[in-house]
Structures are given as structure tokens and as C-alpha cells.
């Protein structure tokens, strides 16, 4: 089922991980998907892909540095999203849902651990 998708599609405090760099990057990802929903064009998709790659790398570095036990599972989730962006079919609803559910299930597992 999953978590409800916010409308308007913006980050809110319920998505807080309490790591400022990660929360700031999550806000950027929400913004990128929001803009893609308004105008599904190559520029918006490219910007979202760039921001997503940067965020995933930063998050993975933090997880590796702390020897986070669910690193491999988490990285596979990231790879799924990157693959979807690299093979974009225009499914903004899926992207919105993926980010919301990824943060609230997968990312929340590392709260206080990285």
C-alpha cells in the first residue's frame, strides 16, 4: 500500500531523517520530481538524475563509513530508482511514490545509525 503522497508534492517534517545534508538533499529530490510533474522534459529529467546521483552517493558514503548493516539492500533500492530514471517512461506518479516510501521505510532505518 505505502504512505500517502503529499499534495502539493513537497518535503515536510514527516520526512526528516535528522541529518541536515540528507534532509536538504531530500528536499531537492522532492523539488525535482515536482518540476518533472509540471513539465516532463529532458532538462528536468536530467537535473533530477544529477541531483539523485549526488544524493545517493553522499548517502552511501555515510552508510559505508558507519558500516551500516543494511547498506547492500539500500544501495539496490538506489539502483532501482536510477535505472528507472535512465529508462524514463514518464511515470511521475511512480517516482513520487517511490521517493516517499523509500524515505519513510528504507531511509528511516538508518536514523541514529550513520
Swiss-Prot record:
UniProt entry keywords in alphabetical sequence: Iron, Metal-binding, Oxygen transport, Transport
Substitution effect: residue 79 to D: In minor component
InterPro entries recorded: Haemerythrin, Haemerythrin_Fe_BS, Hemerythrin, Hemerythrin-like, Hemerythrin-like_sf, Hemerythrin_metal-bd
Pfam families, per the entry: Hemerythrin
Protein family per UniProt: Belongs to the hemerythrin family.
Naturally occurring in which organism (per UniProt): Phascolopsis gouldii
Residue intervals passing through the bilayer: none
PROSITE patterns the record matches: HEMERYTHRINS (PS00550)
Outcome following mutation: residue 83 to N: In minor component
Biological role stated in the UniProt entry: Hemerythrin is a respiratory protein in blood cells of certain marine worms. The oxygen-binding site in each chain contains two iron atoms.
One function term, GO molecular function aspect: oxygen carrier activity
Binding site for Fe cation 2: 59, 74, 78, 102, 107
Misc: The sequence from one of the four major component variants is shown.
Residues at which Fe cation 1 binds: 26, 55, 59, 107
Name of the protein: Hemerythrin
Record text on subunit structure and interactions: Homooctamer.
Amino acid at each position: 500500500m505505502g504512505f500517502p503522497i503529499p499534495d502539493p508534492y513537497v518535503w515536510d517534517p514527516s520526512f526528516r531523517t535528522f541529518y541536515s545534508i540528507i534532509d536538504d538533499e531530500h528536499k531537492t529530490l522532492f523539488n525535482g520530481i515536482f518540476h518533472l510533474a509540471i513539465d516532463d522534459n529532458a532538462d528536468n529529467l536530467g537535473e533530477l538524475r544529477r541531483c539523485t546521483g549526488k544524493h545517493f552517493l553522499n548517502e552511501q558514503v555515510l552508510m559505508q563509513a558507519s558500516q551500516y548493516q543494511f547498506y547492500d539492500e539500500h544501495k539496490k533500492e538506489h539502483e532501482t530508482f536510477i535505472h528507472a530514471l535512465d529508462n524514463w517512461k514518464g511515470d511521475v506518479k511512480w517516482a513520487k511514490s517511490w521517493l516517499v516510501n523509500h524515505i519513510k521505510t528504507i531511509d528511516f532505518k538508518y536514523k541514529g545509525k550513520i
